[in-house]
Curated annotation (Swiss-Prot):
It comes from Finegoldia magna (strain ATCC 29328 / DSM 20472 / WAL 2508) (Peptostreptococcus magnus). This is Adenylate kinase. GO terms for molecular function: adenylate kinase activity; ATP binding; zinc ion binding. It is an enzyme of class 2 (transferase). GO terms for cellular component: cytoplasm. The gene is adk. InterPro entries: Adenyl_kin_sub, Adenylat/UMP-CMP_kin, Adenylat_kinase_CS, Adenylate_kinase_lid-dom, P-loop_NTPase. The lineage of its organism: Bacteria, Bacillati, Bacillota, Tissierellia, Tissierellales.
């Protein structure tokens, strides 16, 4: 099963991706994870990506496409995958369709998690992370036990640069202009299933899994 997961930043795609890949035993291909690995290892690509993300901008198509196809051509993707964070633009979607066609493959479904702007800003700007152990928190729904201190390792938690409200609004604007049109692009191929991302997490999962099991 070859799937794409769409939705604005803060829609809960990561949570749903984990549940879907467990249910259908396919790998989760997250461009965000690939980029973060490069950033952590301070590769040349990682430094470019870090600068762009800090400004709420997208990584250029040619870099992203190269990384994605290198991953999709690996053995564990032979029977399917869940793409999260790619494609983000119409040219990327066209490049993906072209690459799949060359390999005699096609997409099965595009899952779209829809969340309103106010909810997204509240979710994202409330995030806090531990710079030491990577634990994540939220000031409203998952706060630290001691204010501002990581429960696991007692390091002061921080707000990531791309979770600050101004950057969040920029990220949403970029999503609306560049990625949201993908819903129309894939609707023309009759592939899109949209779910309300403000519903309880388990309810969202149930709707996605039920839809995918329809075949």
């Amino acid at each position: 099963m070859r799937l794409i997961l769409l939705g604005p930043p803060g829609a809960g795609k990561g949570t749903q991706a984990k549940r879907v890949i467990e249910e259908f035993d396919i790998p989760h291909i997250s461009t965000g994870d690939i980029f973060r690995k490069n950033i952590k290892e301070k590769t040349e690509l990682g430094q470019k990506v870090e600068g762009l993300l800090a400004q709420g901008k997208l990584v250029p198509d040619e870099l992203t496409i190269e990384i994605v196809w290198d991953r999709l051509d690996q053995e564990d993707c032979k029977n399917g995958f869940l793409l999260d964070g790619f494609p983000r633009t119409i040219p990327q979607a066209e490049a993906l369709d072209e690459g799949l066609a060359k390999r005699g493959l096609k997409l099965d479904r595009v899952l779209n998690i829809d969340v309103d702007k106010d909810s997204l800003v509240k979710r994202l700007s409330g995030r806090r992370v531990c710079p030491s152990c990577g634990a994540s928190y939220h000031i409203d729904n998952n706060p630290t036990k001691v204010d501002g201190i990581c429960d696991a390792c007692q390091t002061p938690v921080i707000q990531r640069e791309d979770d600050k409200e101004e950057t969040v609004l920029d990220r949403i604007k970029v999503y609306d202009s560049q990625t949201k049109p993908l819903v129309d692009f894939y609707n023309k191929q009759d592939l899109v299933f949209t779910v309300d991302g403000t519903l309880p997490i388990d309810e969202i999962t149930n709707k996605l899994v039920t839809e995918l099991k329809k075949g």
